[in-house]
Amino acid sequence: MLVAQSFSAINPGPTAELYLGDIKSVMLTQEQIQARIAELGAQIGHDYRDRSPASDQDLLLVTVLKGAVIFVTDLARAIPLPTQFEFMAVSSYGSSMSSSGVVRILKDLDRDIHDRNVLIVEDVVDSGLTLSWLLRNLATRRPQSLQVCTLLRKPDALRANVDITYVGFDIPNDFVVGYGLDYDERYRDLPYIGMLDPRVYQQ
């Protein structure tokens, strides 16, 4: 398992001209993200290379829409093994800023995952409540293995004990956007991960 990289302070950096003024500072640059994804892909490839010998047993990457779509695409290209994609859409009751852990499925998987090696790919784990529910739900479908890879984890926000095998970065409990992460469906297209200026979501 790769050791997650902790960031104790926000690293200021240039912001793209998109959404000028909305991004308070840059936490992770595009270069940092891509370098870490390359490391994660290599480690996942090493760990799974003897688990998926048959073409119909390619590593199955399960992603919850929409935040991790960019991450899972880049991660799949960094894994030196054949991979397949599956997507779920879930709604977690709670405020726009936090999850209650009460989840309903809006879109389920399109195939049976029985006896498959499944890797859940997340953009960010904060409370861990939704992920904890998802792990329990998918475990009932009897995959051969079930593990988690997340780009970001917020240790200070965790409220559920979830086992995460692959962590890109441990970050402070700040509101971040970019590289797939959004606020009100905006900012997903930023190439970096930045702190959103509080004035944007406190209006």
Curated annotation (Swiss-Prot):
What is its biological role?
Purine salvage pathway enzyme that catalyzes the transfer of the ribosyl-5-phosphate group from 5-phospho-alpha-D-ribose 1-diphosphate (PRPP) to the N9 position of the 6-oxopurines hypoxanthine and guanine to form the corresponding ribonucleotides IMP (inosine 5'-monophosphate) and GMP (guanosine 5'-monophosphate), with the release of PPi.
Residues that, per the record, bind diphosphate = K66, G67, R188
An example of a Gene Ontology cellular component annotation for this protein is:
cytosol
Report the subcellular localization: Cytoplasm
Per the UniProt entry, the Enzyme Commission number(s) are 2.4.2.8
The protein's annotated catalytic reaction(s) are: IMP + diphosphate = hypoxanthine + 5-phospho-alpha-D-ribose 1-diphosphate; GMP + diphosphate = guanine + 5-phospho-alpha-D-ribose 1-diphosphate
Q: What is the lineage of its organism?
A: Bacteria, Bacillati, Actinomycetota, Actinomycetes, Mycobacteriales
InterPro entries in the cross-refs: HGPRT (IPR050408), Hxn_phspho_trans (IPR005904), PRibTrfase_dom (IPR000836), PRTase-like (IPR029057)
Q: Which organism is it from?
A: Mycobacterium leprae (strain TN)
| Protein name per Swiss-Prot or TrEMBL | Hypoxanthine-guanine phosphoribosyltransferase
Could you list this entry's UniProt keywords, alphabetically sorted.
Cytoplasm, Glycosyltransferase, Magnesium, Metal-binding, Nucleotide-binding, Purine salvage, Transferase
